[in-house]
Amino acid sequence: MLKKGFGNFIMNNDKEFLATEPIGKLLLRLAIPTLAAQMINMLYNIIDRIYIGHIPGSGALALTGVGVCMPLIMIISAFAALVGNGGAPRASILMGKKDLDSAENILGNCFTMQIIISVILTLIMFFGNRTFLMAFGASENTIEYAVSYMNIYSLGTIFVQLTLGMNAFITAQGFAKTGMYSVLIGAVINIILDPIFIFACHMGVRGAALATIISQACSCIWVLSFLFGTRSTLRIKKQNLTLKAPVILPCLALGLSLFIMQASESIISVCFNSSLLKYGGDVAVGAMTILTSVMQFAMLPLQGLGQGAQPIMSYNYGAKNTDRVKGTFFLLLKASLTYSIILWGLVMLFPQVFAGIFTSNQALVIFTKKALRVYMAVMFMFGIQISCQMAFNSLGKAISSIVVAVMRKFVLLIPLIYIMPHIFTTDQTMAVYMAEPVADFIAVTFTAILFSVQFKKALAAIRLS
């Protein structure tokens, strides 16, 4: 009884703002630090590529080699999302129900699961990366750059897993600024170490990888010190570390949609790279590395907004406050659409600026300028897709999230990558890039229709309960 009462005391004093504070003010309070963290994380993820692309003499090939590593890196991040972004919304919902014990049980189980996954991934990525990289589109010119990067990066898998996965539980509790600092610490250290290791120590791509895992280790220490400490409402405790199927399996089910979204990016990257290598050679694959980086720039702030809204929607859904759930979603939708439309305009007007950030090779800049306009032609619609996807997760709607993720990636995009070059035969390389906007347009339309039906059902269900 003492434990339960103490938990409620914390909840009432620290988390009641999720149920009472004006939605607009609250979304800003949570989303701005989360959004800042996502922007910092974007820099964190692409800073290696910016420096690598400017290595004298070998920058273009080195950039392409590191770009081929992206499928493996995305798989590592996807497993963090599977556990962290599956468990965190469920913990938030339980916090809304004032069940702190069950929420902490989820946190402990997710921590253990991420350690197990990290060990397995490290072994696979270290000993098998050359085979994967060749399959993912590396050529004889770029394979050694790719292997050099992954040999070092794979050793830091556990830091990536725990930083990304456990940070989701910090944000889900409403500690948005603390979550931002988790990313900021790593980003600052990475930005400082990159030029030292790459240029001053003449380590090239190996230096970029080493800087990344050191900075991730520092972020990991920050995240775990918070979740093991007394400032966190939910804490990692020894009695919750034993895996229990009824606890961890629903978390994995909810996180599966985000896992599919991120892991499928690696499959899609393989499809893009192999098709582009066939029709356009190394320059087309190098351009894809830049397009992927710009896409991260587009998506991460949207995900930051969604993650800022997630604790509000999840908490109030658990508390059966339908008006706040609905109000939060529509505010998220407006903000996300506004951002995606503005960024779409900038990319369409100034594609050479975005391309020039990543490479000083003029031939690659010119090629990427055209590819960017094709690849991101319907980016203005991304706000709808991300808002609906994050809302599905916030409400614990695992099946709907999975359907949306599978629809866009596997049903639409992958087949289109191979179909489009046979339809637009005059420029088959650009036809490969065109698969992205065609798939996006159809997927967003499908998601909006499905969400409008499911959202009404979810709200009606808690009104009747």
What do these predicted ranges mean?
Residues 1-31, 91-156, 200-255, 313-378, ...:
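Short alpha-helical transmembrane segments in multi-pass integral membrane proteins
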Residues 34, 38, 50, 89, ...:
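Transmembrane alpha-helix boundary and packing residues in multipass membrane permease domains
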Residues 35-89, 153-160, 249-316, 336-344, ...:
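Transmembrane helix-bundle signature of multi-pass secondary active exporters and lipid flippases
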Residues 41, 45, 49, 53, ...:
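Juxtamembrane/transmembrane-helix interface segments of polytopic membrane transporters
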Residues 43-46, 54, 60, 94-97, ...:
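Helix-loop interface residues and adjacent transmembrane-helix termini in multi-pass membrane transporters
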Residues 63-123, 160-179, 287-351, 382-404:
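Small-residue-rich hydrophobic transmembrane alpha-helices
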Residues 139, 175-176, 204, 281, ...:
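Short loop-to-helix capping motifs
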